[in-house]
């Protein structure tokens, strides 16, 4: 009520549900929910539970023959959910919301520092849900690596960094947001300032190094929910994480800061549908490192026997239509989709930035 009075919320049901998330475990085990589930589950071979992790153990005791799958679960809770999947024989799996990002439910996974910037109430130009493990261009986001570690499929730790420009500010999160972290060590303007390094790691411990200097070891793996935080001072260079099991190294990962001078680089991916080609556009330095914090507005020009089917990025708040031929890179990346005509003999693609960078390719 206080937030509504201040104009920070408009009182809609989605805002209410976000605020109520801290009480969701209590709500879903209420007897009224139990009664309704009895009717629904009586006619199903497998009961799909949306956001009802708190019922897994309880319902295993109440209904020994009920088989449960997490049909929709929160990304930040994958460690908790997967532990129960492995422990409880009647819980057979977990489906997060969601795998691939999408247009619609705008803002549900967008981290924010002011009401209205993210969440269900995110304003224009927010278009994407931004809750996918994979962004709308097919680029893996940190949550996908978190999940890979939890599933036991990755031995190397994975480094992300919470936005140091916002250090100390309160992050407004919906239940679909883990943090605002990005896997990069490019934070221009934050030199000498504190930063939170967020590491997803297997093993018993993880050690962090900044420019070769150890920042200490902390608990990792299952006992830490596979997510470990270090507060460090940001300085350009390198940040490296090393995971240990029984005192022995089992994996490591390093991020390097990119040089400020960059060029445009194309990476061409042929689609399974022969008429489509996917052209990734990167901002890279002379060493091939992606520059994530100097995004540029790009214009695409297609000539020959092909059409531009789409041009955009993983940014949940694009300012241009995907078929407009104009976009801005997001963390140093954009994607152009080319539709070739039947019998295409040749076509050309040229990408230009507002500050004079250009790159082109022929097909």
Task: Please tell me what each predicted stretch does.
Residues 1-274, 286-287:
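Substrate-binding clefts and catalytic carboxylate motifs of secreted carbohydrate-active enzymes
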Residues 12-17, 312-326:
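Acidic/polar low-complexity surface segments
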Residues 205-213, 295-309:
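Extended low-complexity, serine/threonine- and proline-enriched intrinsically disordered segments
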Residues 218, 263, 301-317:
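Short aromatic-acidic-glycine turn motif
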Residues 228-234, 323-342:
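Short, hydrophobic beta-strand segments
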Residues 235-239, 277, 343-347:
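Exposed beta-strand face motif in extracellular beta-rich ectodomains
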Residues 243, 283, 351-353:
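Conserved structural position at the C-terminal beta-strand
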Residues 246-251, 353-360:
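Short, exposed coil/turn segments at beta-strand boundaries within extracellular/luminal domains
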